[in-house]
Swiss-Prot record:
It comes from the Bacteria. It is found in: Cytoplasm. InterPro entries: MetalPrtase_cat_dom_sf_prd (IPR023091), YbeY (IPR002036), YbeY_CS (IPR020549). Binds 1 zinc ion. The lineage of its organism: Bacteria, Pseudomonadati, Pseudomonadota, Betaproteobacteria, Burkholderiales. Its main location: cytoplasm. This is Endoribonuclease YbeY. Zn(2+) binds at H118, H122, H128.
Length: 157
């Protein structure tokens, strides 16, 4: 059974290449991957996904992480409640995403899919602070992206 998803998408900056339906599909792929990786008991996810510009991305990163620059993706994990629903917010900085895609010689859509999957997994409690956690999270991201026809993002271009 598919994990129930409530997704609120907000556009601080518009990008026609990133419509709601596409972002939703990427989040659903991440949820399905997590369900196959031990999150089978997850009843659902209530997530916010906001696309922002450099100024907002920098402000949020400074305010919540103490780092005075815009980063590619920020995730605010609120945990899974007794109802089995994971809650969180994901913020993707579109100009940083676009710059990284160019630098890494990836398509904008492939990199956007990766950052969306990455942020969704963080919202479900995955992390990459410790080496073992990082290997698990990166392996799951790679599997999820492969299901979407996207190459391993951790291989050099």
């Amino acid at each position: 059974m598919a994990t129930e998803l409530s997704l609120s998408v907000q556009y601080g900056v518009a990008d026609a290449r990133l419509p709601r339906w596409r972002l939703r599909r990427w989040v659903q792929y991440a949820l399905a991957g997590a369900a196959g990786d031990g999150h089978a008991g997850l009843a659902g996810a209530e997530l916010g996904l906001r696309l922002v510009g450099l100024a907002e991305g920098r402000r949020l990163n400074r305010e919540f992480r103490g780092r005075d620059y815009a980063t590619n993706v920020l995730t605010f994990e609120y945990g899974t409640g007794p109802d089995g629903v994971a809650r969180g917010d994901i913020v993707v900085c579109v100009p940083v995403l676009a710059r990284e895609a160019r630098e890494q010689r990836k398509t904008l859509l492939d990199h956007a899919a990766h950052l969306t999957v990455h942020g969704t997994l963080h919202a479900l409690g995955y992390d990459h602070i410790k080496a073992g956690e990082a290997r698990r999270m990166e392996a799951l991201e790679t599997v999820v992206l492969a299901r979407m026809g996207i190459a391993d993002p951790y291989l050099a271009a």
